[in-house]
Amino acid sequence: MAAVINNAMLEAILAEIRPLIGRGKVADYIPALASVSGDKLGIAISTVDGQHFAAGDAHERFSIQSISKVLSLVVAMNHYQEEEIWQRVGKDPSGQPFNSLLQLEIEQGKPRNPFINAGALVVCDMLQSRLSAPRQRMLEIVRRLSGVADIAYDPVVARSEFEHSARNAAIAWLMKSFGNFHNDVATVLQNYFHYCSLEMSCVELARTFLFLADRGIAPHLEAPVIAPIQSRQVNALMMTSGMYQNAGEFAWRVGLPAKSGVGGGIVAIVPQEMAIAVWSPELDDAGNSLAGVALLEKLTQRMGRSVF
């Protein structure tokens, strides 16, 4: 399976993609992210049979941002019954920008899915209700999944996002007005921004998300992370809603479940085979890594992998 993959192959693909750097734009609405150099490019792959590959800036940590929304959903799945989650947040793509208020108003405070901001805030609200220390719990889970003990939040990024949180606060208050938000808004926003500020490398992300390629099982942990059916459900949500309003185009070009973040990272899953993490900070108009999407497209073509 993984015989076609090696570090030299990944380096060659990076060289083909590198000319795209300069065509996107680093996220500038979060000041702490705006200072990141746009010329970074990295990829890492972890396979279910225990192989690991990396190239470029794969060992450099960056702000994972909305990739964390997958992890917060997984934590919620371990603390809530299925119906408790999905009566408060939907399972459908939104077709709208990830921070849209319009759709939320029309649909009476129930977000379309857990990977847009409104949906992730509902999930964080649920974690606040059920966990005594949700920020510490998330850190423990990420460190356990990755096998890396020093993964941490970036307090500068978290503070920067909180200081520019008017729109997310508006989303939370709108949901509160519809009865779909139960805790203190500022407290939940702080948790949400800390999750987004997690600093991880491509290598760490690929290992962390490997459980989604293996029916909810992380190879180095005794107990399953989530049940096989839940792993399938998370992959389905990533396929339909993980790439903001460009999920359809990404499915067309790449054909894998994936989740992106405005820090320039993307995690993609080849079910039963591998987890892939890429990073390039310059974004396209939808907020996805421009070179990162192209890198995944080239890689999946080279490997002949797709869920379709």
UniProtKB/Swiss-Prot annotation:
Documented EC number(s): 3.5.1.2
Catalytic activity: L-glutamine + H2O = L-glutamate + NH4(+)
Gene Ontology BP, a term: glutamate biosynthetic process
UniProt cross-references to InterPro entries, sorted A to Z: Beta-lactam/transpept-like (IPR012338), Glutaminase (IPR015868)
Superkingdom of source: Bacteria
Residues annotated as binding substrate: S66, N117, E161, N168, Y192, Y244, V262
Keyword annotations of the record: Hydrolase
Keyword RNA-binding set for record: no
Disulfide bond among keywords: no
GO molecular function terms attached to this record: glutaminase activity
Subunit structure and binding partners: Homotetramer.
Similarity remark: Belongs to the glutaminase family.
Name assigned to this protein: Glutaminase
